Amino acid sequence: MTEQKRPVLTLKRKTEGETLVRSRKTIINVTTPPKWKVKKQKLAEKAAREAELAAKKAQARQALSIYLNLPTLDDAVNTLKPWWPGLFDGDTPRLLACGIRDVLLEDVAQRNIPLSHKKLRRALKAITRSESYLCAMKAGACRYDTEGYVTEHISQEEEAYAAERLDKIRRQNRIKAELQAVLDEK
């Protein structure tokens, strides 16, 4: 046995033919961040979007608050028509005589009509600021009193004023619609 060398097992064995090659550090690029980080970013983005939307809505609400909240034309007509049918041609309001509000207020006091000054004033504003009323204001058109009689005719200046008011009201309605759309979005 001495002739044959028996290999001895050791823990530190050198391998023949291999030399140690020092390798560099390998850099691993992670393309996706961890799930907790993604979730945190999504929550932060959602909170930022909600805060921005809330700020937009608050700004739109404040901008919308400057406009007068008048009743609709149908509500205004239904408020005044039972007491003064001469002011209307069917369900469409006729052009009102100048100073009609004072006449209507006196009539309310004399006949004890259950209509407050505020409701009367708002109904008249809703009627006189409606697009159909302003479109009807053409030179030569007649103005009517509470009984339905012609009192005067529309002048050129009144027609020009009505056209200006109509443009302003249409512009305001367009702005109001945009602001309302901002408030209605989720």
From Swiss-Prot:
Which lineage do the record's taxonomy fields give for this organism? Bacteria, Pseudomonadati, Pseudomonadota, Gammaproteobacteria, Enterobacterales
Q: Which family does it belong to?
A: Belongs to the FinO family.
Q: Which GO terms describe its molecular function?
A: RNA binding
Give a short account of what the protein does. One of the components on the FinOP fertility inhibition complex, which inhibits the expression of traJ gene, which in turn regulates the expression of some 20 transfer genes. The transfer genes are responsible for the process, called conjugal transfer, in which DNA is transmitted from one bacterial host to another. RNA-binding that interacts with the traJ mRNA and its antisense RNA, finP, stabilizing finP against endonucleolytic degradation and facilitating sense-antisense RNA recognition.
This chain's protein is named Fertility inhibition protein
Checking Gene3D superfamilies in the record gives: ProQ/FinO domain (1.10.1710.10)
Alphabetized UniProt keyword annotations: Conjugation, Plasmid, Repressor, RNA-binding, Transcription, Transcription regulation
Q: InterPro entries of this UniProt entry?
A: Fertility_inhibition_FinO_N, ProQ/FinO, ProQ/FinO_sf
Q: Which domain of life is it from?
A: Bacteria
* S-S pairs: none
Gene name? finO
